[in-house]
Structures are given as C-alpha cells and as structure tokens.
UniProtKB/Swiss-Prot annotation:
Residues holding L-aspartate: 172, 218, 446, 487
Annotated source species: Streptococcus mutans serotype c (strain ATCC 700610 / UA159)
PROSITE patterns named among the record's database cross-references: AA_TRNA_LIGASE_II
Residues that bind ATP: 218-220, 227, 480, 532-535
SUPFAM superfamilies from the UniProt entry: Class II aaRS and biotin synthetases, GAD domain-like, Nucleic acid-binding proteins
Top-level EC class: ligase
Protein name: Aspartate--tRNA(Asp/Asn) ligase
Length: 583
C-alpha cells in the first residue's frame, strides 16, 4: 500500500528515494530524455527519465493511461520550471528504474478535462471517465459530504439503521420497480421509492432518532437532476416540532458546507410560506440568488378594456402579473423573443406581452393599454430606461408558474446568477392537498402520511382544499434538495387522510393494514425529512447534471451503457418466475 499518494509529493520529500506508482497522463519523449506526467487520484507528478535508464526504449511505444512503477529520487525543480497549478509542482522524480505494470490500449477518448467527449461514450467507458481530475474531485466531494452528514448525525445521537430493499408495492407515488418472486407464485416485491413507512415504524419501535443514507428507486421520466435509482439522506425523530427538525437539518447542512467547501454559513436560513414563494417567485423552489420578483397588476387592470387584459381576467382566478428584467430592452433577437413567448404559453396562460422603458415611458404594444398608469407601473417594477417588462395573463396558478419559469430562463440568459452563492431557503405552510383534474380527486402535496395543521381526522372533511400541512421543504439555489413533515401518528387521522384521497376502506386496509395497526400500539408523535444527496452534491460541485456526481449512473433513457443494462434474460429464468414476454 502506498505511504503517500504521488500527487502529494512536495519539498519535504526532496532527497528521498521513492517508488511512485500511477497512470501515464502524458508523455513527452525528446529522444535522449523524456518527461512523464504520472497521475494517481491525488494529482500529478513529473518524472524525468534519462535515456541511460533501463527500459527507456519501451517508452516510445507507451500509450497514455498505462501504469508505471518508477523508482528514483525526489528533487526540487529549478525555479523557472515550477508548476504552480499542481500540488507537486515544486518537485520532480528523477527516474532510476521503470517498470511497466500494465499497458493501455489507445483510448476511445481523451481524458483531459477540457477535451470534449460525448455523453454516450463517457457512459460506455465510465471507468475511464472517472480517471479525469474533475470526476475524481466530484466523488471525493461526495465522500466529504456523506462523512460530514454521518459525523453530525452520529454526534446528535442518531442511530444508523438499514431498511429492506425488497418491499411492498403501494399506491400514491411514482411507478414502482417490481421484482417478481420465484417462491411466491404470481407475487411481486417492489424496490422502495423511499423508506417512509419503515422509518416511521422505527419511531414506533422506540428508536427516537434514526438516519440512513439509502438508495431509492422510482420508475419515472428522467431529467437532468433525476435518476431511476438515487440516494437520499433519510432521517426521522420522535417528540419533535417542525422547528426542531428544521434546526437539526440546518445545522447539518452548515456542517456539510464547511466540511466540503470551507465556507462558514453563519446566518439562519430564510423561511417563507408556500404562498409567498408562489406569489413572489412563481415557484415552490425559488432561486433567490437574483431578484426579478413577480408583481401583481390585477387591480390595476380591472376596468381596462384591453382585449389582452380582459381575456386573462375572465379566466377562473384570472390575474395579470409581470416581471421586470433590468437592461434587457435590447438583449434579445426576434427569434429569442419568440422562444421566450412559447416557453410562457406552454404553461397554458391566456396571454403574453412585453414592454420596454424609454425616456421614462412604457413603450411597445401595451403603450396605450397602460397610458394612464405609466408612473404606477414604473414604481411597481422599479423600472428604468432600458428595462423590459414581461406581462402574462390567465388563471393564477398558471400565470405564477409561467412567470416563475420565465424568471429562471431570463436570469440564465442575462447572466444574473452568481454561481458562487449558496442560497438556502425553507418553504413552509404547504397546502395538505391539491386537486388532480385528471384523476378527479385530491392528492397529497407531499405524501399521505403528512400531518395536517391539526390532527383530528373528522375536521379534515369540511374544507380539504383549505387545509394546511405541517410540511417543510429545504431549497438550495432553485433546487428542492429535501422535504419533510410532521407525520400522522393516530389511526383515525390516517384513515381520514386515506379517505380524503379517494381510497376505499378495503383498499387502504389491504395496502396499509400493517401500518394502521402499528399506530394503535402507543405510537409517538414524530417527524423527519429526506434529503436528496445526489442533487445536493451536484450543486456543491457546480455541475448541471447529477450524473456527474454519481460513480455509475444511468443515461438519459435510464439505461447503463457500460453494463448494457437493462437486458434480455434467459427463457429459463423467465420460466422459473412463471413470466412470459409480450411484444
């Protein structure tokens, strides 16, 4: 085993005779001498090789990524040749002997950080991709994050408990990954979407403080920050308030940032309600690294005969709202403006329009529409010459979501986002339920085990759409990185929740009977949170896709190009499971 990684060699090793083992990152052969950049996981070390060294001739045919063992003396570099960009840049290894431990074929793509390689080939040769400095750094960062989490929770008297991967398929979630049972005819296990009920049962078992860094599985459509299998930091506590959980998680995240980024976060995380988040930012996971808040023009627009305004106001909960982009009047071409309009209209709003500010006046297609309210508009948006105002009309929720999406797009296009910022935010006071028009019933905003603002199940049936939950989400830079709540801990309340979700008694007793019975054996009040580890590390690593912080991820279609998974299986395996394939 190495006593010191070669990337960590420095002046303190000068004069020592060492054997350095690593991969050839680069080789420059000048005929009678050669320079090799030898790499291990901690960095690079320059090796100087004279032609008098045995096996020097073998270097002519050596490919990058071959593995060498080089024995020699560590010497200080001449000041003129010091490399300040690597940790070992003040020294080099003068080779005395070279052993080729393993040769490499020609690479399918260059591993230099700046070299462009397609996603498919990177996934197929992931073991090569992970040799790149950036990818190694991402995995080391992930390790630092998980270590900081474990250290913090262990210090807070949490118990790390594993829960099973072969569980029961239940409704009220994304699609399950199913595992057919060979022993139990025509029956299936499901891979867990989360250990939700199991961690609650651990509270019923009296453990009081539980955590687990656990793999979860959801058969859902993929995007940049999602994978079919992902890792979450799962925790649960008994006898706690919402504030207790938030304080614990906030302290943990501050410890994570300090351990992984060296940044001391001293301010308390801001807290806003779900309603405030939607009203101000058009999103339940707002990015607060930039301003551009939504403004409501509904009252200002009432009585205005403009067809643009009236078309939106006639909608149910019709509103007129807008955002102001600073210095954006000349920032976009006609084609870009058409793209922005399509982005907004895809949310199902009634109308979209823009105006620019010139010489203190609103100009453009809405100039006459707001001619009597020019001063009010400028004050409301704090608009100045050169700014552009985007107006959207339609039903409240769709307008808010459209402007929320537009707000983020504009911030990226106008380069308003400070990528060095880490803006955490708590979103609280969520509605307990939301109406699903496709299913024609209520569904839980979080999950069906979330406690309402009061517990008596009989009260929930009066005005379910107005019922608030005791839930909270933690947001970082516009990403929801975690969510949790206080949980229902009485059977009557849990049954009432299932019924509000349109479940029949025989159905919820079949699917959740074991859990309902557990609630009758002295179940403590409890709450917790699940934190998306992949997404958190992605943000801390300043990556745009969680695949960059997972060692062996699936691609955008949910396949593993390296393992060639999923794949067909033998007929014999299917027969043992009593399964037959259909086209």
């Amino acid at each position: 085993m190495k006593e010191l990684f070669i990337g960590n060699y420095g002046l303190e090793q000068v004069g020592q005779k060492v054997t350095a083992k690593g991969w050839v990152a680069n080789i420059r052969n000048h005929g009678k001498l050669a320079f090799i950049e030898l790499r291990d996981r901690e960095g690079l070390l320059q090796v100087f090789v004279d032609s008098a060294v045995a096996d020097f001739d073998k270097l002519h045919d050596l490919h990058k990524e071959s593995i060498l063992a080089v024995t020699g003396e560590i010497v200080a570099r001449d000041e003129r040749f010091v490399n300040p960009h690597i940790k070992s840049g003040q020294v080099e290894l003068r080779a005395e002997t070279i052993e080729i431990i393993a040769s490499s074929k020609l690479l399918p793509f260059e591993l230099d950080n700046h070299a462009h390689a397609g996603e498919d080939i990177r996934q197929k040769y992931r073991y090569l991709d992970l040799r790149r400095e950036k990818m190694t750094a991402n995995l080391k960062l992930r390790h630092q994050v998980t270590k900081a989490i474990r250290d913090y929770l262990n210090q807070a008297d949490f118990i790390d408990v594993e829960t099973p991967y072969l569980t029961k398929s239940t409704p009220e979630g994304a699609r399950d990954f199913l595992v057919p049972s060979r022993v139990f005819k025509n029956q299936f296990y499901a891979l867990p979407q989360s250990p939700q009920m199991l961690k609650q049962l651990l509270m019923g078992a009296g453990l009081e403080r539980y955590y687990q860094i656990v793999r979860c599985f959801r058969d859902e459509d993929l995007r940049g920050d999602r994978q079919p299998e992902f890792t979450q930091v799962d925790l649960e506590m008994s006898f706690v308030s919402e504030e207790d959980v938030r304080n614990l998680v906030e302290g943990m995240l501050k410890a994570v940032v300090k351990a992984s980024k060296g940044i001391e976060l001293t301010e308390a995380f801001p807290i806003i309600s779900y309603a405030q988040a939607m009203r101000r930012f058009g999103s339940d996971k707002p990015d607060t690294r930039f301003a551009m808040e939504l403004k409501d023009l509904t009252e200002l627009s009432r009585g205005n005969t403009s067809l643009f305004l009236q078309k939106g106001l006639k909608k149910e909960n019709g509103v007129v709202m807008g955002i102001c982009a600073k210095n954006a009047a000349k920032a976009f071409t006609n084609r870009q403006m058409a793209t922005l309009k399509q982005l907004v209209m895809d949310f199902g709003v009634a109308g979209f329009a823009t105006a620019t500010i010139e010489k203190g006046q609103v100009t453009g297609s809405l100039k006459s529409t707001f001619k009597d309210h020019n001063t009010e508009l400028l004050e409301l948006f704090e608009a100045e010459d050169g700014d552009m105002i985007f107006f959207v009309t339609g039903s409240l929720k769709r307008v808010q979501e459209a402007l929320g999406g537009l707000r983020v797009r504009l911030a990226k296009d106008l380069e308003l986002i400070d990528n060095d910022k880490l803006n955490f935010l708590w979103v609280v006071d969520w509605p307990l339920l939301e109406w699903n028009e496709d299913l024609n019933r209520y569904q839980a905003m979080h999950h069906p085990f979330t406690q309402g603002a009061f517990e008596d199940g009989s009260d929930w049936k009066e005005n379910p759409e107005k019922m608030m939950s005791r839930a909270y989400d933690i947001v970082l830079n516009g990403y929801e990185i975690g969510g949790g709540s206080l949980r229902i801990h009485k059977r009557s309340a849990q049954e009432a929740m299932f019924e509000l979700l349109g479940m029949k008694k025989e159905d919820y007793e079949r699917d959740f009977g074991f859990f309902l019975e557990a609630l009758e054996y002295g179940f403590p009040p409890h709450g917790g949170l699940a934190l998306g580890l992949d997404r958190l590390v992605m943000i801390l690593a300043e990556e745009g896709n969680i695949r960059e912080v997972i060692a062996f991820p699936k691609n955008g279609q949910g396949a593993d190009a390296m393992l060639e998974s999923p794949s067909l299986v033998a007929d014999q395996q299917l027969a043992e499971l009593r399964l037959a394939l259909r086209d």
